[in-house]
């Protein structure tokens, strides 16, 4: 266990296990300090988005407890004001990370983070009342209207229902406020390219081999549709995340809370955030399992797969510049090699693909965290901090990668129309359009001879006089091959 730094000034706080030296200027107390000493694992605290969501939740809980007649107006207002400071990032106190230091790899229920929030809120109230940090358990202070971390901030709650609730709230807010808008912007750019480039005909490719022609706009309309469908999947993820565990307290029975508490807090969160939340239909399922969270993470996996497909296709189509496909001209954003002068690499595409890989890894960790016998054991899941941190990282990475992809690549992406036309004319797949006129076998033989003699399908068909020239011109028009027959 880490030892105390003798140079750090401390104050003495107490919890149910006794006295604990705590750094003098931090807002947390004894329970949090024990967790700091117990879990020196990764050096990563819970994400800021999660801490802010916890503060939003604690505020809603206080307001509902007042509405139910369990908490007086003065304490409710004090707790709400403290939560506002946390939501704003505690900039006057050195930032969230300083006061929410508990490692991601902590107790699997997230109890340490819940107590961290309770203690910070209570100590912010102490400061607001002109009392020193650490006064929140002083009897005289409490009799005078002070706020206790457990009795008031945590009233009607348990770590076992607040932490899973904060998981859903933080994930839903991040998806709704960060990822969906980023995908709106990405979809708009892809759709813009699809419309602008619909006149450009190029060769299609299946199995990385030449296929029949396709319009560049058609390809990009497919990419735009992928993102539109991803947005639909995200909407469904928001729906499963909207169900909250709050109100179940320790094991789902609701001991020590009001029967309407969970419902009213969900309504308060909806009003405050603009994202819809509702009380869980079954609190035992909501606390004992994490199926909804796995489903939401799986949605992010599907979204990542879509992004990887688009980025990889553009990387292939931009390969070259002289010896690759070269149908797209990728913007040069940085030198690509320390040994090959003038080389420019598809670094933005590579970054997006790496993000997708990381999201898939995060999803696997989330899935394991919900797996029976690993995280989900009897009446509580005990891998929640890790699950929450991984899913929130996935949302952040996907949102940032989407904007980066759009700003640093798509907006300045250009087609090489001459290259597209040249590759179509040289493709053996052009013979496909002759099948209705001369049959499959003759078309296949034509393609074979054209390949062997280094000629285009058009040149050889004219030489062999297989069809009248006007008919050949009509059948070998590349654009006509990009639509179904009219009849």
Feature locations, PLM:
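Conserved, well-structured ligand/cofactor-binding cores
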Residues: 1-487
């Amino acid at each position: 266990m880490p030892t105390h730094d003798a140079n750090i000034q401390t104050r003495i706080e107490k919890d149910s296990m006794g006295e604990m030296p705590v750094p003098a200027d931090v807002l947390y107390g004894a329970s949090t300090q024990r967790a700091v000493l117990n879990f020196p694992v990764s050096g990563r605290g819970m994400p800021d988005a999660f801490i802010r969501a916890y503060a939003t939740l604690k505020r809603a809980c206080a307001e509902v407890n007042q509405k139910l007649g369990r908490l007086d107006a003065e304490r409710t207002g004090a707790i709400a004001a403290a939560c506002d400071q946390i939501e704003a990032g505690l900039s006057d106190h050195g930032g969230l990370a300083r006061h929410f230091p508990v490692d991601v790899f902590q107790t699997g229920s997230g109890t340490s983070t819940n107590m961290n929030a309770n203690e910070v809120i209570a100590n912010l109230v102490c400061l607001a009342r002109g009392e020193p940090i650490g006064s929140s358990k002083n009897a005289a202070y409490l009799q005078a209207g002070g706020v206790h971390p457990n009795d008031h901030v945590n009233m009607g709650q348990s770590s076992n229902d607040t932490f899973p609730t904060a998981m859903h709230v933080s994930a839903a807010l991040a998806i709704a406020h960060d990822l969906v808008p980023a995908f709106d912007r990405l979809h708009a750019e892809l759709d813009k390219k699809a419309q602008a480039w619909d006149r450009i005909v190029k060769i299609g490719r299946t199995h990385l081999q030449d296929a029949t022609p396709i319009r560049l706009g058609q390809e990009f309309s497919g990419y735009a549709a992928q993102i539109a469908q991803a947005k639909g999947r995200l909407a469904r993820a928001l729906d499963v995340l909207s169900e909250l565990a709050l109100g179940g307290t320790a094991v789902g029975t609701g001991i020590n809370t009001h029967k309407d508490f969970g419902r009213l807090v969900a309504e308060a969160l909806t009003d405050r955030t603009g994202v819809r939340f509702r009380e869980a239909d079954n609190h035992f399922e909501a606390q004992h399992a994490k199926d909804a969270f796995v489903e939401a993470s799986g949605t992010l996996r599907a979204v990542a797969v879509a992004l990887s497909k688009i980025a990889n296709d553009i990387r292939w189509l931009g390969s070259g510049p002289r010896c690759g496909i070269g149908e797209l001209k990728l913007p040069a954003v940085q030198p690509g090699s320390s040994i090959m002068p003038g080389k420019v690499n598809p670094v933005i595409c590579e970054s997006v693909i790496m993000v997708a890989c990381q999201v898939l890894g995060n999803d696997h960790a989330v899935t394991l965290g919900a797996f029976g016998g690993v995280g989900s054991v009897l009446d509580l899941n005990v891998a929640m901090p890790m699950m929450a941190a991984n899913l929130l990282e996935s949302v952040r990475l996907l949102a940032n990668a989407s904007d980066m992809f759009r700003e640093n690549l798509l907006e300045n992406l250009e087609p090489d129309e001459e290259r597209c036309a040249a590759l179509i004319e040289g493709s053996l797949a052009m013979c496909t359009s002759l099948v209705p006129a001369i049959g499959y076998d003759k078309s296949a033989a034509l393609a074979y001879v054209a390949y062997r003699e280094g000629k285009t399908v058009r040149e050889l068909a004219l030489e062999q006089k297989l069809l009248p020239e006007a008919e050949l011109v009509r059948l070998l028009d590349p654009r006509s091959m990009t639509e179904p027959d009219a009849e």
